Regions:
Chain B
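Surface-exposed patches in mature extracellular/periplasmic domains of secreted proteins
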Residues: 61, 131-136, 187-196
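Electron-transfer interface patches adjacent to heme c in soluble/periplasmic c-type cytochromes
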Residues: 7-20, 74-173, 183
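Electrostatic cytochrome c docking/interface patches
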Residues: 30-54, 66-74, 79, 101-103, ...
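Post-cleavage N-terminal segment of exported redox proteins
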Residues: 1-42, 177-206
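The canonical Cys-X-X-Cys-His
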Residues: 49, 55-64, 176-180
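Sequence context of c-type cytochrome heme-c attachment sites
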Residues: 28-37, 47-48, 63, 85, ...
Length: 536, 206, 396
């Protein structure tokens, strides 16, 4: 058995390395027919070189929105088709963000006020915390991420969204599914595994809803009006293929048990981040950063390396959640090695994102959405580097089982994906409604609240987690030390979290105001020629 | 990167490969292990208690996977020897956990065997540990004027006891404690057992 | 507007990225190659643990030296007036089952060997010796001291072991002669003076509690044997137990649960509980479980390590670490998690109540490996036999 496993293990890693080497060779020898020119796919003729942003102070004047739209005449037609689906998805997502982050704050407070709200079963820490996770992952991030994809995909494919009604039905079903899942969790009915708490019976509904998102997006990609698939499209197509399979396999009832189930659990849970939220976030950043700046990304060949290396390595990192646990040594080692190899795609993506922004720093000043998105991209780099280091056995001994991991998870899911989504929404909504944001000063307010709040959250909890880990490893200190040492940092986390929640409520209110404003007045920017955009 | 179908197929192939390595291969290896000698299946009451453990979300603060003494002093804290895959043969769903806001519970039945202690602790952890941040679970208990036959009255220090009447455990609490008491893995692990030996001290085995 | 920057049509992958990729790949290959070795070491550690629990690596003579010679002397002469000799003992000349049953159950009562009568206080070795160990030891001892060579099988030991847990120590030679082998000749009767009177008040406190706190037995077990970090209490000196309970109240010894318990107990309750446990006998359920080095542990327990300023355990806690009343508790058959936790508690200050604060200094000089070695080795020793002073501390 040892020999066969060793062999399998070696083969697996060598297969990944071989694929990586082949990819590098192919890119460097121009075997893949993509060029830097393809990076211009996201621009219409004459648009490249001009910033595209509707939230800058300069563009708040009368001509601002119009000027941005000047370059979007063709797409205005495309945008109009996807508009109802995008608005439904994003408004659902933001509603889940508001509710979900309030539950997060309650859970955080309960950790240092353990006798607060203990009378009702549904308000116990174990349930409130789980409600937070499921609402923000499956409600906020997934729905908003899909909503952004529904808006971006037609633009990069130069054609209108196919089956544009399906996503609306999907969004309704998905909302019902997440709400039913939340009610189930609150009432104590859950499947018992992290990230998979929603009962599998309810998951069936969510899976059906998901197919209503996947189908239109893939159909749109298949019938695109441009030969090349822009890098954002790779991430979206791959994510849309990956997530349904992940979700289905992990939720099959009755066939898993014991430690074997734990490997499925963490294979799934990490891939939700790696093969679902990350592609949604990285894909969006790959579109919005060059789009807002008005210049193509730094190196298109690097983006190929970034994408395929992510697929090869991210898919096998999950078992680093079980380091030192009762699972086979080889599968843990395999996940550790792949976690460390994640440096390769992350560096590739980081060079592309950050060099593009660094060469155009002026744009950060001008555009708050770009600030959100490029800061999100920086946090992707940091979260990934941190994750790779955290997977090393020596580091993991300290950080595993502590609040450090919680801080890390938030750096990825919040600092990276949520920030990119915030920026994307700020960029998109004026183009969807045809109007500027009603309270422009609320956008930087939201930005600074979540940046400061998250900085407090992350730094506090990271320090607390390390202290907690060292206390737990020191046998001379009783277990109570690990609790007492982290307590002040849990309080700091609540403070940071509260500031973040205020930011979210401002964001949600602002978004609502922008929507109501549209309903109050007839949409100003009607598509000029819808037919020409949708004709195939 | 101009064609969608090859892109999708390759992406799916990579995921299939990852699934083979992280799901199927470990499953084959772990499923071939017999339950650790000495491991007993759960009784009906313990299983009901296990459902309570899941429903209350105990897993979010308590792990059930002691680490090896080469990695961490879990064994010295009384949390038990390093667990192995075959210790979990009867666990559905698995409850390994990833946080230790509270201590590991894989051997809580051995190091804290008292039902009465657990009931007090569930009702109000701070009645025992002033520093504890574990939630209190008063909704698993009820206050009665007088205990009826068959009621389990919980013991509380004077400053935590109700002014009138007694606190008795509901069935949920009794089930949960029965499950906790069953967490006793003090039997030895087989030599060839499966676990992450990555921390085993390098050098010659003594 | 910024002017349009000239972009190259094609950029190869930057060299630093390639170098990083190659370096990480090499590290990955190395790490994977190392994987197989870790599994081998892990298995060796588990197999050592199983072996430690059964101590099955010693032959009969080695077992005799490590387990018997401390009391019975290396030449089997015993100690006049205290420990019966093995040489020419009728108990060894009898069928091999007699020696086997004595090893499994221990003796707690008077026996006659030759012309002398001894107050028997032999511990049970059931927890210490495996079936195979007992076969080897009995064969060695009977062959060496009684020139008897008929054999015992492991099956015989396994069958007898099933009963041993239930019946407790032999109540002197008379019971052995009556139950096992009449050829032992006349044996002294069990005197009623050594029969401990069970204190009903203490018994109620231990098994049901006092209504204000949890019963002692709910954690320490009905036989006071404890488990994991809950200590074994059976056979500890009465005064020691009472003192610990008092120290929980004053805070010289800290443990949240025990402090709550002790505060509900009156001083006379504490003494009653101490008396109750001091005469209690229970088979050992402790086993080495911290991965400690038993050879090193044995050396530290029996000889200490004067280079590091460590006295032996036996120098205060008595031969075989059976304890020296009133202040020095028995250490043998104690759970290693508990022993190790106390040794760290002396260092961290959560416990500060040893005689002359001796333990603070000793514990501070033990490193992690030594602490585990000592705790594990003590767990492999037989439980304390009946104390010579039993019954007396009841003050009657």
């Amino acid at each position: 058995m040892t020999l066969t496993i060793g062999l399998l293990l070696g083969l697996s890693f060598f297969a990944s390395l071989l694929a990586l080497a082949f990819l590098i060779w192919a890119v460097n020898n121009r075997q893949l027919t993509i060029t830097q020119h393809d990076a211009y796919t996201i621009f219409t003729e004459g648009e490249a070189g001009h910033p595209d942003d509707a939230t800058t102070e300069g563009s708040q004047d009368e001509g601002g929105a119009a000027r941005a739209h000047h370059f979007d005449t063709e797409r205005a037609g495309i945008d109009a088709i996807s508009r109802p689906a995008v608005v439904t998805l994003i408004s659902s997502g933001i509603a889940w963000l508001a509710i979900g982050s309030i539950f997060g704050l309650i859970a955080s407070l309960k950790l240092h006020w353990p006798d607060w709200l203990v009378g009702e079963a549904w308000l116990t820490f174990g349930r409130v915390r789980t409600l937070h996770l499921n609402m923000v992952i499956y409600g906020w991030l997934s729905m908003t991420g899909i909503g952004v994809a529904m808006w971006v995909a037609p633009r990069i494919f130069h054609t209108a969204l196919r089956y544009p009604k399906l996503p609306i039905i999907g969004a309704i079903l998905w909302n019902v599914g997440v709400a039913a899942g939340a009610i189930a969790i609150a009432s104590g009915w859950n499947d018992g595994q992290e990230w998979l708490e929603i009962p599998w019976q309810i998951d069936i509904l969510i899976a059906i809803a998901g197919s209503f998102f996947v189908l239109p997006l893939l159909a749109t990609a298949a019938r695109r009006h441009v030969k090349h698939i822009y890098v954002t499209g790779w991430y979206y197509i791959a994510a849309l293929c990956w997530f349904p399979i992940l979700f289905f396999i992990a939720n099959i009832p009755y066939i898993y048990s014991g430690v074997q189930e734990a490997t499925v659990n963490w294979w799934f849970a990490h891939n939700v981040l790696g093969l679902w939220l990350t592609p949604l976030g990285v894909g969006a950043a790959y579109y919005f950063i060059p789009k807002i700046i008005g210049k193509p990304i730094y190196s298109y060949s690097l983006s190929l390396l970034g994408f395929w290396a992510l697929a090869l390595f991210y898919s096998q990192v999950g078992i680093h959640h079980l380091i030192g646990g009762p699972v086979p040594t080889w599968v843990v080692t395999l996940s550790i090695v792949h976690s460390v190899m994640m440096f390769v795609p992350v560096i590739a993506v980081a060079i592309n994102h950050h060099v593009t922004v660094a060469r155009n720093l002026w744009a950060l000043k001008a555009s708050v959405p770009l600030r959100f998105i490029s800061l999100g991209a920086v946090m992707y780099t940091l979260a990934s580097f941190q994750g790779s280091i955290e997977a090393l056995r020596s580091v993991n001994s300290v950080t595993h089982f502590t609040q450090y991991t919680v801080a890390h998870a938030h750096l990825g899911a919040y600092g990276f994906v949520s920030f990119v989504m915030f920026g994307a929404v700020y960029h998109m909504l004026p183009r969807i409604t045809g109007r500027s944001w009603p309270w422009p000063s609320m956008i930087p307010a939201h930005f600074w609240l979540v940046v400061v709040g998250f900085a407090i959250y992350f730094i506090g909890l990271t320090i607390g987690g390390v202290l907690q880990g060292f206390a737990m490893l020191d046998v001379a200190r009783p277990f109570s030390d690990s609790v007492q040492v982290v307590l002040p940092y849990l309080e700091i986390r609540s403070l940071g979290g509260a500031v973040m929640v205020v930011g979210h409520l401002i964001f949600a209110a602002h978004f609502l105001a922008a929507l109501i404003q549209r309903d109050a007045q007839a949409p100003a920017a009607q598509p000029h020629d819808t037919r020409s955009a949708v004709s195939t | 990167m101009n064609r969608m179908v090859p892109l999708a197929i390759l992406a799916l192939a990579i995921l299939a490969f990852a699934t083979l390595m992280l799901v199927i291969a470990p499953a084959i290896q772990i499923r071939s292990e017999a339950p650790t000698p000495g491991l007993k299946p759960y009784t009906a009451q313990q299983l009901r208690g296990r459902t309570q453990y899941v429903a209350q979300g105990c897993i979010y603060c308590h792990s059930q996977q002691p680490r090896s003494i080469d990695q961490a002093p879990d064994a010295e804290r009384g949390w038990g020897r390093a667990s192995v895959a075959s210790d979990y043969a009867y666990d559905r769903p698995h409850l390994l956990g990833t946080m230790r806001t509270g201590p590991d519970l894989f051997n809580v039945g051995a190091r804290l065997p008292s039902r009465g202690w657990h009931l007090t602790h569930l009702y109000q952890p701070r009645a025992i540990f002033g520093w504890s941040i574990m939630p209190a679970y008063p909704y698993l208990f009820e206050r009665k004027e007088h205990a009826e036959p068959g009621d389990v009255v919980i013991i509380l220090p004077a400053d935590r006891a109700p002014k009138k009447g007694v606190i008795v455990a509901k069935r949920e609490a009794l089930d949960l404690v029965a499950y906790l008491q069953s967490l006793d893995h003090t039997f030895p692990a087989p030599t060839r057992a499966v676990r992450d030996d990555g921390y085993a001290e390098k050098g010659e085995p003594r | 507007m910024e002017s349009f920057e000239p972009y190259e049509e094609f950029k190869p992958i930057p060299l630093p990225v390639l170098i990083i990729a190659v370096a990480l790949a090499l590290w990955g290959v190395f790490t994977l190659l190392d994987n197989g070795k870790a599994v081998t070491v892990g298995r060796a550690e588990r197999s050592d643990q199983i072996a430690d629990q059964h101590a099955n690596r010693q032959n009969g003579a080695e077992l005799f030296v490590s387990r018997c010679a401390t009391c019975h002397q290396p030449n089997g002469s015993g100690v006049e007036g205290a420990i019966p000799p093995l040489a020419s003992s009728p108990f060894l000349k009898a069928s091999p089952e007699v020696a086997m049953h004595i090893l499994l159950n221990g003796i707690d009562g008077p026996i006659r060997v030759g012309d002398a009568t001894f107050e028997g206080h032999m511990p049970s070795f059931a927890s210490v010796l495996s079936d195979a160990d007992i076969v080897r030891l009995v064969t060695h001892v009977r062959g060496t001291f009684a020139d008897r060579h008929d054999l015992l099988t492991e099956g015989d030991v396994a069958t007898a072991r099933l009963l041993a847990g239930r019946r407790g120590a032999w109540q002197g030679g008379q019971e052995i002669a009556a139950r096992l082998d009449a050829s032992l000749g006349p044996q002294p009767p069990m005197s009623s003076a050594t029969q401990a009177a069970i204190d009903p008040i203490a018994q109620k406190l231990v098994s049901q509690g006092n209504g204000q706190t949890w019963a002692c037995a709910s954690c320490h077990g009905m036989r006071g044997q404890g488990s994991a970090s809950v200590p074994r209490l059976a056979g500890l000196p009465a005064a020691y137990i009472a003192k610990q309970l008092g120290d929980y109240v004053t805070g010289k010894r800290r443990n949240e649960t025990m402090q709550l318990v002790a505060r509900t107990l009156k001083p006379q309750d504490m003494r009653r509980i101490g008396d109750y446990y001091s005469v209690m006998r229970a088979p050992s359920n402790a086993r080495a479980s911290l991965g400690g080095d038993l050879v090193r542990g044995e050396r530290l327990v029996l000889d200490g390590d004067w280079a590091r300023g460590l006295p032996s355990c036996v120098s205060c806690h008595g031969p075989s670490t059976f304890g020296v009343a009133p202040s020095f508790p028995a250490l043998s058959a104690q759970h290693p998690e508990y022993t190790a936790a106390q040794l760290t508690a002396w260092v961290s200050g959560t416990r500060d109540n040893s005689t002359g604060r001796l333990m603070n200094g000793i514990a501070a000089r033990l490193n992690d490996a030594d602490r585990r070695a000592v705790a594990d080795y003590l767990a492999t020793l037989p439980p304390v036999p009946a104390p010579a002073t039993r019954g007396r501390t009841n003050g009657k």
